[in-house]
């Protein structure tokens, strides 16, 4: 075979002409230390705060400490096989999670990856987990209710759309139960829900998911999970990921509800990350910015005006306001609400529901202490019928608690005092409610009307529960149009008052409880 020099030179020229030089600039660094999920990297001169750093094995770390000659980052996932000398790259991206309607009904981890075995998640795009909260001009006042389905909460501590209402109490006082019931009550309200589980047992979360499914609320809910076995970094970031998923609905003129269960564990995870990054500790060994940790998260829960929604959707949605309502949960130690994290979150939120161990153990469930529970903005959002009928409930309970304490020392009580004590006991009994049994506005209105207008006076204390059950069954069976009307309008006028009075009179005549 004879080589033709002309052909060879032509072939080389063609190859040179077709040769495509692709050059990529990578900001590359070297791992200099690995310990407890925290890595120190040398050489990442252009790294941003919060930037994702690409690690070997398709993993990422987040840059949290930018120092003069190194970067401190926390690994998102397993880190046992990382070693000194390994090369890492900057990505130029802040941590993002998938958002959209496809996430409803799914259980995902902090990074938005599905963990429920139902296949890949359908999403409408990605959103950064850290977003600046809407400004003052973009907000609208809270004036629409979020019904929790609990008589004691909706009557005395009402929650509005766009509000931040803290649920606080010791362990085993029913905090999660209250939040889950609030989610179950939204299944027909059109409010989308996000439940963020932080640092809990996997078995507990599985039980919550099963209960949501049983009550038909899972299809309306996104469950974001960072279990106790996951790294502190994932537990610290889980609430921000859940918030980004909830903001998707708020920014498109819809209403969403997010539950953070619980922020005490998030603060502990953040403390762990901060100490590993060698940040200086402060009170209770928490870092100096633990207030900002929660304030920047909870400020994102808001009600935004129609102009904000229109600008965000580029005119696709007009004349609609959006809201994200937050129910953060805080666990206290022996009822100490003056500890560091509880006082921080109390000062950030728009009110708190305080659950007490003593009330819970004495059978008063939900164990709400109406004396120190408050809603600072929810009153404007309360439905008309509940607002009108609930005024005397808080007063009756306050007077009852005062008299009950006094009556322990008094041997003989006058008739008026005995009557007040009896009424207070019956109202307390009436406000008891079983778990997974949220009540509609009409049912609450009817029960409050009975308490307010003295229909409980001749009912024995032991029969209050059966009286309520029989009354609600009677109303749903024989007065369905009235109940439907109240549920639709939430209104209260002389006509509705007259109908409720005749309903209760006819029910009392049956003596069927």
From Swiss-Prot:
Enzyme Commission number(s) from the entry: 7.1.2.2
EC class: translocase
Record-level Gene Ontology MF annotations: ADP binding; ATP binding; proton-transporting ATP synthase activity, rotational mechanism
Keyword Transport recorded: yes
Matching PANTHER family: ATP SYNTHASE SUBUNIT ALPHA, MITOCHONDRIAL (PTHR48082:SF2)
Primary location class: membrane
Subunit description: F-type ATPases have 2 components, CF(1) - the catalytic core - and CF(0) - the membrane proton channel. CF(1) has five subunits: alpha(3), beta(3), gamma(1), delta(1), epsilon(1). CF(0) has three main subunits: a(1), b(2) and c(9-12). The alpha and beta chains form an alternating ring which encloses part of the gamma chain. CF(1) is attached to CF(0) by a central stalk formed by the gamma and epsilon chains, while a peripheral stalk is formed by the delta and b chains.
Site description Required for activity, residues in chain: 373
Alphabetic keyword roster: ATP synthesis, ATP-binding, Cell inner membrane, Cell membrane, CF(1), Hydrogen ion transport, Ion transport, Membrane, Nucleotide-binding, Translocase, Transport
UniProt binding sites for ATP: 169-176
Family that this chain belongs to: Belongs to the ATPase alpha/beta chains family.
HAMAP family in UniProt: ATP_synth_alpha_bact
Record's keyword annotation contains Cytoplasm: no
Reactions catalysed according to its record: ATP + H2O + 4 H(+)(in) = ADP + phosphate + 5 H(+)(out)
Official protein name in the record: ATP synthase subunit alpha
Top-level lineage group: Bacteria
GO cellular-component term (any): plasma membrane
Membrane-spanning segments: none
Purpose of the protein: Produces ATP from ADP in the presence of a proton gradient across the membrane. The alpha chain is a regulatory subunit.
Membrane topology field: Peripheral membrane protein
Compartments, as annotated in UniProt: Cell inner membrane
Source organism per UniProt: Cronobacter sakazakii (strain ATCC BAA-894) (Enterobacter sakazakii)
């Amino acid at each position: 075979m004879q080589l033709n020099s002309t052909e060879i030179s032509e072939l080389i020229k063609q190859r040179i002409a077709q040769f495509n030089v692709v050059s990529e600039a990578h900001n590359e660094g070297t791992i200099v230390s690995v310990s407890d999920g925290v890595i120190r990297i040398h050489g990442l001169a252009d790294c941003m705060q919060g930037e994702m750093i690409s690690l070997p094995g398709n993993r990422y770390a987040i840059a949290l400490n930018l120092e003069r000659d190194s970067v401190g980052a926390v690994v998102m996932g397993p880190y046992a096989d990382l070693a000194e000398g390994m090369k890492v790259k900057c990505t130029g991206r802040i941590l993002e999670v998938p958002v959209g309607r496809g996430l409803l009904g799914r259980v995902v981890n902090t990074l938005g990856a599905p963990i429920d075995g139902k296949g890949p998640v359908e999403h409408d795009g990605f959103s950064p987990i850290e977003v600046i909260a809407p400004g003052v001009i973009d907000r609208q006042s809270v004036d629409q209710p979020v019904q929790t389905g609990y008589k004691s909460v909706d009557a005395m501590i009402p929650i509005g759309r766009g509000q931040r209402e803290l649920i606080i109490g010791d362990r085993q006082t029913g905090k999660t139960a209250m939040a889950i019931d609030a989610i179950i009550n939204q299944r027909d309200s059109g409010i989308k829900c996000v439940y963020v589980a932080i640092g809990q047992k996997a078995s507990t979360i599985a039980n919550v998911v099963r209960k949501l499914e049983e009550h038909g609320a899972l299809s309306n809910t996104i469950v974001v999970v960072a279990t106790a076995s996951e790294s502190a970094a994932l537990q610290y970031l889980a609430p921000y990921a859940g918030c980004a998923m909830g903001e998707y609905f708020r920014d498109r003129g819809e209403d969403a509800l997010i539950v953070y269960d619980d922020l005490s564990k998030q603060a502990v995870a953040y403390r762990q990350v901060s100490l590993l990054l060698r940040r200086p500790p402060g009170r209770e060994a928490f870092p100096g910015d633990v207030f900002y940790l929660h304030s920047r998260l909870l400020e994102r829960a808001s009600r935004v005006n129609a102009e904000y929604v229109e600008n965000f959707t580029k005119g696709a949605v007009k004349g609609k306001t959006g809201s994200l309502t937050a129910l953060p949960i805080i666990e206290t130690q022996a009822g100490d609400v003056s500890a560091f994290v509880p006082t921080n979150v109390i000062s950030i939120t728009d009110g708190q529901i305080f659950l007490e161990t003593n009330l819970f153990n004495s059978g008063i469930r939900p164990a709400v202490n109406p004396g120190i529970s408050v809603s600072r903005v929810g009153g404007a959002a309360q439905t008309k019928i509940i607002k009108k009928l609930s005024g005397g409930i808080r007063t009756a309970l306050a007077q009852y608690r005062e008299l009950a304490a006094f009556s322990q020392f008094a041997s003989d009580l006058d008739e008026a005092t005995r009557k007040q004590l009896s009424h207070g006991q019956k109202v307390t009994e009436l406000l008891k409610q079983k778990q997974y049994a949220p009540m509609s506005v009409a049912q609450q209105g009817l029960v409050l009307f009975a308490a307010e207008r003295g229909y409980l006076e001749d009912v024995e204390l032991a029969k209050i529960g059966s009286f309520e059950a029989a009354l609600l069954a009677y109303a749903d069976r024989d007065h369905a149009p009235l109940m439907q009307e109240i549920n639709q309008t939430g209104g209260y006028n002389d006509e509705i008052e007259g109908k409720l009075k005749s309903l209760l009179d006819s029910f009392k005549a049956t003596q069927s409880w």
